[in-house]
Amino acid sequence: MNIRLYNSLTKQKEEFKPIKKKEVGLYTCGPTVYDYPHIGNLMPYIIWDVLKRILKVKGYKVKHIMNITDVGHLTSDADDGEDKLVKASRESGKNAWQIAEFFIKVFRNNLSNLNITEPTKFFRATDTVKEQIEFVRILNEKGYL
C-alpha cells in the first residue's frame, strides 16, 4: 500500500515519492521555548511522530531534524509583537538563555512522557540564522512559498 499525503501547495492528496530511495529527510519546526506547553502545542509533534513511525514500518530510514526557536518569536494572534523570550526574561528576572535551556528540558520531558520519538537532531534557531535565511531563499526560488 502506498503512502498518500496532502500537498498544501497543490491542495491535493498525492502519492509520497522520496527523493532518495528508502530514505526520508524530515524537517519540522519545534517549540518556541519560553513557557510551558499545553496539549494543543504538543499535537503537531504527535502527528509528526505517527508519520515517522509509518515511514519506518514501510522500510524508510528517517532523518528528522527539528529546530527549537530560542529567540525572535515575535507575533501571534493575541500579542503585541514582543519577542516571547525577551518578555519571559523581563517577567522572570532570568536571562533568555536560561529560560530557553529550562524549557528545552521541559519539552524533551514532554516528548518522553507522551512516548514521542525524538528527532535525529535538534538545533537552535540562534545557531543557524544564516542557514535558515538561505533555506527560505531556496524554498522561495523553487516556488514553495
What are these regions (language model features)?
Residues 1-145:
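NTP-dependent nucleotidyl-transfer catalytic core
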